[in-house]
């Protein structure tokens, strides 16, 4: 029996021209454990997203075993809630067989969709599981019409857009592509474009692309300008939390399909309260066509978790309002200020209520936080104090006068939220009962989705003059649904007079009918193992003759670096600055335009291009395309995606270890009996982060970007261990933070050639021209003469010898 979701989804009237159409709005809540699962479904979510014990981008959340996922899916479907499974990490070749077992299990156990980052996995799932929906993860970093068009052709049903995408572009994607769009509306924000961040991976061996981000963006850094500090130690990269409640009307009217709440690692109280806040706001706007007054709601959300709120890039927040540089964690709600200090007590002037068992934090150089056990107002102990009152508290630390006081936990509010989380919403059903002499009793149960369950008793009612059953008692027995997920909204009885019906028979009939209804409601898709297509995907090759030596590719950032290459026969030269590209071509006619991590445009005068986004693949008919090392190619199936789109030359991910690289190349050989032109980075500072936010402008108290300070000064971030991370920007003020150490794999180039790598890559970022020449000469001598004449200071092997990311 097929179930429609229509009745469980919020509907909005969206005007298009002179007509009006109905647009579904889905509220999608995060679930990291069973407590947050119940909090989400009991507070208005009509879809949830969860992760298993593997392949989930929140590896440190509790997550779920396979059997727990099976139970969760059944229970969610019973409550008319869809379940999307996050399979949103990059996948290594040696994990494919384990992953397939996991996906088969999820497919056969009724998961509604897979959330996927890995391009190869997207393609593989589209071919193997034709009856499941694919949602592209925000980790794929989709922010343009061209990217969305490409992914739609791959079989994608929905795209979770990059958080950097402004609402105007969101609307363009919806209108021009015709695909479901999901956006984040609340929760933590990454400072780097999702899927491009290697910072945790490189400095801490915990890859964000593998679900293990250690959040180094929440650490302190000092901004240096021309080698001198230009800031105190601050949390320069710590983003505020997204909150779009006050603009929910604009989001509804935009045509977005799904509103997503971030927070699989947050508490059940957080999940419940945030879900309820957005559910209430959406319903209110749809009913009244005006915004709900969210003042009280916003106070609750501040108390649960916030690092200060922002409207984000989605709603064009100012650059200086995107981050909080003085603290990276939960700050709560401001409740007052310290107005007097004594050896063991303080007085606080309140602007908000404060109660016993609340937790406060006093903001000073060394924050002080504690739970309130007792407090006084006007020398009397009180359980609660109110705005404008002066409250006296005992303290055991040195407190600064005039320090701001924030409440970071409200005991009473938490209790109210926990109670709301437990309030199960009952599903309305209609019962129809009939009983006639010497015939089996019949009970029919119907729900609003169209399920109709009929059960019959083995017992045949008998006539009785004294112990017959009246209709009132029958209805009372049949509607005893307290321990179920249902409530009876109507019951009809057709009962012949003076029949003897034992109560246990009525109870048995009710229990059997409810069990069958529950079973029917919990299965949405009715899939079978025969649905799974086992045909392997392949890639389209152009035969090539292998070069007797490794080819050399070099990426440079400026004309001076390019000029330094003039005396070297470099095979591929990549150049990124569009403004000076014409000049670059005059210096060296072999130069190839590199689009950069975010830009997708290719100058017409460039016959070839190094691309970083699938949105650039539309240029394949007019340009020779090369996939960059940052395209996240970590398995043979992603290789096939690029091959099938005419790209024969591709860079493999710098997150691949030596073993993973070998396994990938061997698998491509095994499946296709030949190799495309593989490129691998052996020298250069990795791009740890690429971001839209400019912390340089903010440090100088500028509201917006385009200050051009980066054009006249050299900037870097210095962390608590005194590692220096150079900074470069592009013409659109996107900021790239480079690694503090330089990758240097000169001792491995023989291995790379032996396994099938054709091109080794040198990336230059902040190097002076002389350094460029020294490094190129070093690698040229190694390739052609097997000589090694120099060492590179502050070098790193990156992940080449690290299998566990």
Model regions and ranges:
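Active-site pocket-lining/capping segments in soluble small-molecule metabolic enzymes
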Residues: 19-142, 160-258, 265-805
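Short, positively charged and aromatic/hydrophobic N-terminal segments
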Residues: 2, 6-13, 18
């Amino acid at each position: 029996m097929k179930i429609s979701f229509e009745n469980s989804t919020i509907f909005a009237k969206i005007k298009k021209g002179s007509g009006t159409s109905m647009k579904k709005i889905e509220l999608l809540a995060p679930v990291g454990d069973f407590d947050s699962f119940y909090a989400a479904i009991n507070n208005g979510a009509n879809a949830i997203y969860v992760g298993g014990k593997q392949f989930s981008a929140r590896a440190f959340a509790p997550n779920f075993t396979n059997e727990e996922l099976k139970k969760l899916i059944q229970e969610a479907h019973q409550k008319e809630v869809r379940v999307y499974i996050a399979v949103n990490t990059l996948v290594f070749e040696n994990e494919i067989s384990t992953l397939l077992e996991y996906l088969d299990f999820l497919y056969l156990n009724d998961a509604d969709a897979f959330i996927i980052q890995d391009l190869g996995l997207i393609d593989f799932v589209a071919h193997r599981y034709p009856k499941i929906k694919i949602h592209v993860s925000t980790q794929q970093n989709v922010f343009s019409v061209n990217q969305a068009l490409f992914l739609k052709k791959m079989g994608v049903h929905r795209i979770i857009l990059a958080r950097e995408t402004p609402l105007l572009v969101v609307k363009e994607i919806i209108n021009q592509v015709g695909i479901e769009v999901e956006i984040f509306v609340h929760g933590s924000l990454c400072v780097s474009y999702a899927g491009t961040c290697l910072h945790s991976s490189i400095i801490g061996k915990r890859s964000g692309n593998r679900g293990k981000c250690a959040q180094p963006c929440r650490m302190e850094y000092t901004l240096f300008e021309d080698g001198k500090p230009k800031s105190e130690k601050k949390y320069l990269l710590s983003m505020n939390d997204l909150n779009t409640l006050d603009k929910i009307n604009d989001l509804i009217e935009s045509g977005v399909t799904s509103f997503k709440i971030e927070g699989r690692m947050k508490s059940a109280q957080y999940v419940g309260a945030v879900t309820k806040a957005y559910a209430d706001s959406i319903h209110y706007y749809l009913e009244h066509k005006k915004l709900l007054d969210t003042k009280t709601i916003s106070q609750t959300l501040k108390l649960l978790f916030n690092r200060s709120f922002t409207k984000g890039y989605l709603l064009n927040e100012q650059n200086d309002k995107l981050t909080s540089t003085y603290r990276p964690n939960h700050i709560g709600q401001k409740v007052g200020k310290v107005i007097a200090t004594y050896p063991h007590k303080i007085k606080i002037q309140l602007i908000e209520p404060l109660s016993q068992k609340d937790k406060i934090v006093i903001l000073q150089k060394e924050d002080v936080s504690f739970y309130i056990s007792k407090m006084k107002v006007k020398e009397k102990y009180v359980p609660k104090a109110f705005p404008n009152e002066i409250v006296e508290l005992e303290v055991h630390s040195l407190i600064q006068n005039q320090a701001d006081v924030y409440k970071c936990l409200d005991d009473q509010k938490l209790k109210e939220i926990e109670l709301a989380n437990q309030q199960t919403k009952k599903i309305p059903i209609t019962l129809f009962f009939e009983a006639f002499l010497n015939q089996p009793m019949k009970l029919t149960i119907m729900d609003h989705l169209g399920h109709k369950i009929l059960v019959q008793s083995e017992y045949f009612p008998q006539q009785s003059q004294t112990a017959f059953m009246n209709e009132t008692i029958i209805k009372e027995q049949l509607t005893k649904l307290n321990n179920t997920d249902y409530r009876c909204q109507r019951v009809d009885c057709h009962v012949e007079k003076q029949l003897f019906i034992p109560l246990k028979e009525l109870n048995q009939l009710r229990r059997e009918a409810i069990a069958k209804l529950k079973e029917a409601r919990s299965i949405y898709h009715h899939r079978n193992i025969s649905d799974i297509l086992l045909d392997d995907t392949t890639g389209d090759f152009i035969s090539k003759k292998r070069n007797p030596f490794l080819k050399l590719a070099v990426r440079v950032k400026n004309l001076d670096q390019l000029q330094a290459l003039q005396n070297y026969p470099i095979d591929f030269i990549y150049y990124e600055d569009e403004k000076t590209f014409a000049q670059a071509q005059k210096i060296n006619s072999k130069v190839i335009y590199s689009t950069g991590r975010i830009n997708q445009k290719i100058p017409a005068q460039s016959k070839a291009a190094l691309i970083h986004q699938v949105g650039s693949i539309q240029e394949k008919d007019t340009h020779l395309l090369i996939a960059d090392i940052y395209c996240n190619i970590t398995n043979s199936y992603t290789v096939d995606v690029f091959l099938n789109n005419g790209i024969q030359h591709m860079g493999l991910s710098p997150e691949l270890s030596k073993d993973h690289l070998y396994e990938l190349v061997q698998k491509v050989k095994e499946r296709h009996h030949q190799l495309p032109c593989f490129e691998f980075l052996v020298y250069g500072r990795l791009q740890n982060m690429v971001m839209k936010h400019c912390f340089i402008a903010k440090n100088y108290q500028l509201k917006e970007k385009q200050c051009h300070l980066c054009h006249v000064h050299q900037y870097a971030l210095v962390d608590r261990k005194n590692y220096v991370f150079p900074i470069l920007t592009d013409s659109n003020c996107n900021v790239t933070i480079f690694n503090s150490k330089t990758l240097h794999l000169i001792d491995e180039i023989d291995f790379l050639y032996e396994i099938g790598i054709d091109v080794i890559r040198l990336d230059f970022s902040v190097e002076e021209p002389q350094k460029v020449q020294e490094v190129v000469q070093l690698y040229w001598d190694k390739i052609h003469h097997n000589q090694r004449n120099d060492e590179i200071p502050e070098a790193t092997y990156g992940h080449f010898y690290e299998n566990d990311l």
